[in-house]
Amino acid sequence: MFTLKILVYTVVIFFVSLFTFGFLSNDPSRNPNRKDLE
């Protein structure tokens, strides 16, 4: 069960970070200097 819990937490953190990065990278008002990192 411990390994399963670690796997679940890893997947959740991965998706949350991916969603956050995507949201911030698509918001030019918050990151005006990241337009060249498309």
From Swiss-Prot:
Protease found in the keyword field: no
Membrane topology category: Single-pass membrane protein
Signal peptide: none
Residue intervals passing through the bilayer: 4-24
Any Gene Ontology CC annotation: chloroplast thylakoid membrane
HAMAP family for the chain: PSII_PsbI
Protein name per UniProt: Photosystem II reaction center protein I
Lineage summary: Eukaryota, Haptista, Haptophyta, Prymnesiophyceae, Isochrysidales
